[in-house]
Curated annotation (Swiss-Prot):
Function: Encodes for at least two polypeptides: protease (PR) and reverse transcriptase (RT). The protease processes the polyprotein in cis. Reverse transcriptase is multifunctional enzyme that converts the viral RNA genome into dsDNA in viral cytoplasmic capsids. This enzyme displays a DNA polymerase activity that can copy either DNA or RNA templates, and a ribonuclease H (RNase H) activity that cleaves the RNA strand of RNA-DNA heteroduplexes in a partially processive 3'- to 5'-endonucleasic mode.
SUPFAM superfamilies associated with the record: DNA/RNA polymerases (SSF56672)
Entry keywords, A to Z: Aspartyl protease, DNA recombination, DNA-binding, DNA-directed DNA polymerase, Endonuclease, Hydrolase, Magnesium, Metal-binding, Multifunctional enzyme, Nuclease, Nucleotidyltransferase, Protease, RNA-binding, RNA-directed DNA polymerase, Transferase
Annotated catalytic residues: 26
Full protein name: Putative enzymatic polyprotein
Keyword Transmembrane helix on entry: no
Residue ranges of every copy of the Peptidase A2 domain listed in the record: 21-99
Domain Reverse transcriptase: 231-413
Gene Ontology molecular function, alphabetical: aspartic-type endopeptidase activity; DNA binding; DNA-directed DNA polymerase activity; metal ion binding; RNA binding; RNA-directed DNA polymerase activity; RNA-DNA hybrid ribonuclease activity
Amino acid sequence: MNKITYMTIKISIPKYMSRIYHGLFDTGANICICKKKVLPDELWHKTENLVLRGFNDEKHVAEYRADNITIMIAKEKFIIPYIYAMDEMSPDIIIGATFYNKYSPIELDIGKGIIKFTKNNEKYPNYLVKYPKKRKLVPWTKGNPSVTETMENIGINQIESRNPIEEEINQILGTDIYGENPLEKWEKHKTLAKIELKNETDNIYKPPMLYQETDLPEFKMHIEEMIKEGFIEEKTNFEDKKYSSPAFIVNKHSEQKRGKTRMVIDYKDLNKKAKVVKYPIPNKDTLIHRSIQARYYSKFDCKSGFYHIKLEEDSKKYTAFTVPQGYYQWKVLPFGYHNSPSIFQQFMDRIFRPYYDFIIVYIDDILVFSKTIEEHKIHIAKFRDITLANGLIISKKKTELCKEKIDFLGVQIEQGGIELQPHIINKILEKHTKIKNKTELQSILGLLNQIRHFIPHLAQILLPIQKKLKIKDEEIWTWTKEDEEKIKLIQDYSKNLVIKMKYPINKEDMNWIIEVDASNNAYGSCLKYKPKNSKIEYLCRYNSGTFKENEQKYDINRKELIAVYQGLQSYSLFTCEGNKLVRTDNSQVYYWIKNDTNKKSIEFRNIKYLLAKIAVYNFEIQLIDGKTNIIADYLSRYNSSDTDGRYDEANT
């Protein structure tokens, strides 16, 4: 009598993170079969077409076979002699007679949930699965086999299907844009990068590091993988060994979470001595604003972005690095070289610039956006053609198609709204409040920069802390209780942020309101909009800053005037269309802007210069009571001793 049951099995493949599946053990199946994505692509080889008969005698043709696959049940290893690929089945994997014959006899007691193998005469309770799941099948992740990859489950009786529109978009896109090696289609663009030193006679040399024994197999894995892919080569010319940077292994929390270490090269000396590529990286706010009136979004990621670009032959020597196994150099544009982002951005701009009315590119991240489904189909088809024509390789694993809400550049974008991604807040909350050095401070300030438009008066809070970045390396690092309290305060604010900001979609609703205020050492503003025929004012974003040293000597009126200018300038990207109203509670500033004057004092000449800069912007000015200017007042007047609250409302 045939017996079938599901059992937890782990598939372990060298150089890949392991995966756990609920395999169907079927004593009536003649062979082992699985869906093709259950195993890495390179394990499959073409075979003579094998006709498989399934339930109800339906026929399927198997074209691929893999041999000697290691699986684990409990902590014991077993070998599947051979297995065929077949996607037209519900379970991810079926274990059949080729396995049982190797390890027979096998005792299977479904009632007690026990399976027993003669391999070691041991029983394995609790590995039989009562409510099996199947996996969402994605490309395998390279890494340490001792680490198990986290995968999404799909109920075994569920149909794994896309939204019909998403499926249609996927059909338009096709599969030819995807791949694993970014050099696969390099001949289509033949892009080369050049590294130049400021002084050609300079040495770039740092001695090799001391390595832990546990690092050796990690280096071996990374080096073998990158040589195979064509990214690096062994350096045989030792005459120019004046170029050498040390490599090291990073295995921190994020690496442990993804189950794979990183090999990092210390290119500080190279970055100091190389000429700077002065090609700009686009402003994230500018990019996001371009897409905010769209409704449908598809996101793509260039596979191992920088590696699309090869290095000129004379530039390779500058990238030379040492590992325990020897001496190597890059054949492609390396990570860690400070010009790599600019070089790659220039490469991407050259390809996509004519299509920036519906495509956003930030280094290796790409967003296609459209207002309608039909428009999105056209845009996706165009993106496909551009990608194929220029030899770009896209990561299938990171592709998201036809979403009405999507994560991009640290925020969630949807039509008429920007929302802060929760993981950004979590990262801030996880940071220690005791900062040990400038590197740790730069790390948390980089995170806080991502929420600067969501937290009022942030510049004021950070002012004393940011000054510590000017401390020279040889000076003693100090971190006081007051500094610690400021980080704690920001973390407290982060727990209760208004994380979603609304923006107008229609031009008729673009009635912009900018509220400004200033204190002795800081200025602040907030941007709102008021839809047509509505009394509600929706909050869009905050902006704050601190006065320069010479500006701190100004009287409060001139500081308020600077606040007006900074508010108009910082929001100009959003307010270039529609009407603008600036609100201030400073009557002198209101008078200066509202009335033309011909005073000729030296002091007023400076003010007139600032007024001339402000006059570039077309806006109305409104004088309001200081008590009603709550948001802007909070922005600039922060003081931990006189406020324990915050303005949480997103509208008034």
